[in-house]
Amino acid sequence: MVHLASIVSDLGFWPTVAGTVATYLFYQIVATVYDVYFGPMSNIPGPKLWAASHIPYILMLWNGEDASTKLALHEKYGPVVRVSPTELSYREAQAWKDIYGHQTRGKKSFPKDSRFYAPAVNGAPSILNADDPTHTRHRRILAHAFSDKALKEQEPLLKKWSDMLVSKLKENVEKSPSTPLDLVSWFNFTTFDIMADLTFAEPLYMLEGSTYSPWVRTIFGSLKLGSRLRAVRILPGMTTFINMIMPNSMRQKQVEHFKYSADRVDKRLANKNLDRPDLWAQVLKRVDVDGMSMSVAEMHSNSAIFMLAGTETTATLLSGLTYHLLQNPATMSKLVNEVRSTFPTRDDINVETLQRLPYLNACLEEGMRMYPPVATGLPRLTPKGGAAICGTWIPEDVAVSVSQWSTYQCEENFHKAKLFIPERWMGEDEQFANDNHAAFQPFSTGPRNCIGRNLAYHEARLLLCEVLWNFDLTLDEKSEDWLNQPVFTVWEKDPLWVRLQVASR
């Protein structure tokens, strides 16, 4: 009798389970159909499959196809595209203001999407991922380290490293004149040594050794993995799941990597009276002034951010710009002539004069438009209650961003958008009179725009000028298709092989 009751009970259990699962699936299908065709974002253009499921978007990010796919989607669907059930991509100038700009008249700011901005290993906020009040405090303290006055004081340090770059390049050219050099690596060596000198008061000695340090190799190795983990975290509940299954060895590597920079900050802080114009010299002057403060843990978090955001991006700008100049000989010749005619000797090169070179600055802008160091969108979340973006109301908790690559390649924003033409930035050619410069924000905009913008410009001008003043460049055939690159938050760059010849005087 008991056995029979058990059988009956079992037969009743499984139909119940099947019915529950079927009901759940039916509900999900109905909810998805409603959301895609009748929900508050059903009027936003985009592929229906992407609006119904996160999977296509996650696969796009996983494969490094963010820039190319979003460009294709925008060209098909227009200025705003629904790229997942809970994410929108924009390419309009107004979207920069609505999403990232200063919010007035009681409007709420758009918080950063925590799935994209991972917390530091020590849990302390940095200027990149802090909430608004903490970000304001950090920025007020750090702003002095990136001011024009501070950058002027840092010029000898920048010149020291630009001199070493030229010296090392000449050394290689003299050793093997016909061998092409990978300028991606050389620009990385230089920008990392500069930022380490500014952040830790000691370089990484990559230029001196002409090779990547193990620490920097770890940084580059983590970019792809980090981008893919961010993609997976888009799925609800995956952040907790990833934390559960992450091997202890990987956690230990994260800790060791963070400790490397933290130890060097501690070493610099132990020498508070060190007389040099680095970042922490400026910060230490501001801490506890006017009630402002920054904990040592926060300094550790910020130093880790500086060592990526202030290095790889500048090297990317220089690499991409060099490639485009080499693919456009007339433009290269015009820029080289401006540089060499302005500075009769190398000693004449200085950051103040470089700021005033019109064609050099136009080339930098065009380089960032054609090859933005951060090609993806930087996602924010619509605030509680929702918000209007480009005149359309978007519900709360939707990830929104401006896709830089799509925006800069859009003919509605820039005439002949897919061509490298620095003259568009000089205001002299009528065919570019309607270019929408407000759509161009390579350093973002608003209260959380890139604090290192001035340093990046000074550094890029100086390093490019030094290379062009000292060398004649020719693109090696191995790098003809160099631009064909995946994106994992930043471009995954192949070597840029360039033949250098010391310029004759």
Curated annotation (Swiss-Prot):
According to its UniProt record, where is this protein located?
A: Membrane
Q: Which cofactor does it need?
A: heme
Enzyme class per UniProt: oxidoreductase
Which InterPro entries does this one have? Cyt_P450 (IPR001128), Cyt_P450_CS (IPR017972), Cyt_P450_E_grp-I (IPR002401), Cyt_P450_sf (IPR036396), Cytochrome_P450_monoxygenase (IPR050121)
UniProt GO molecular function: heme binding; iron ion binding; monooxygenase activity; oxidoreductase activity, acting on paired donors, with incorporation or reduction of molecular oxygen
Locate the transmembrane regions by residue number. Answer: 12-34
- Cited CDD domains: CYP60B-like (cd11058)
Cite the EC number: 1.-.-.-
Does Isomerase show up as a keyword for this record?
no
Keywords on this record?
Heme, Iron, Membrane, Metal-binding, Monooxygenase, Oxidoreductase, Transmembrane, Transmembrane helix
Q: How does it sit in the membrane?
A: Single-pass membrane protein
Its Gene Ontology cellular component terms are: membrane
- Which residues of the sequence carry a binding annotation for heme? 450
Name the PROSITE patterns for this protein. Answer: CYTOCHROME_P450
Q: In which pathway does it act?
A: Secondary metabolite biosynthesis; terpenoid biosynthesis
> Which top-rank group of organisms is this from?
Eukaryota
Q: Name one Pfam family in it.
A: p450
Family stated for the protein in its record:
Belongs to the cytochrome P450 family.
PANTHER family with a match to the protein in the record: CYTOCHROME P450, CYTOCHROME P450 MONOOXYGENASE ASQL-RELATED
Q: What does this protein do?
A: Cytochrome P450 monooxygenase; part of the gene cluster that mediates the biosynthesis of enfumafungin, a glycosylated fernene-type triterpenoid with potent antifungal activity, mediated by its interaction with beta-1,3-glucan synthase and the fungal cell wall. The pathway begins with the terpene cyclase-glycosyl transferase fusion protein that most likely uses 2,3-oxidosqualene as substrate and catalyzes glycosylation immediately after cyclization.
* Name by which UniProt lists this protein: Cytochrome P450 monooxygenase efuB
* Organism of derivation: Hormonema carpetanum
Protein's gene:
efuB
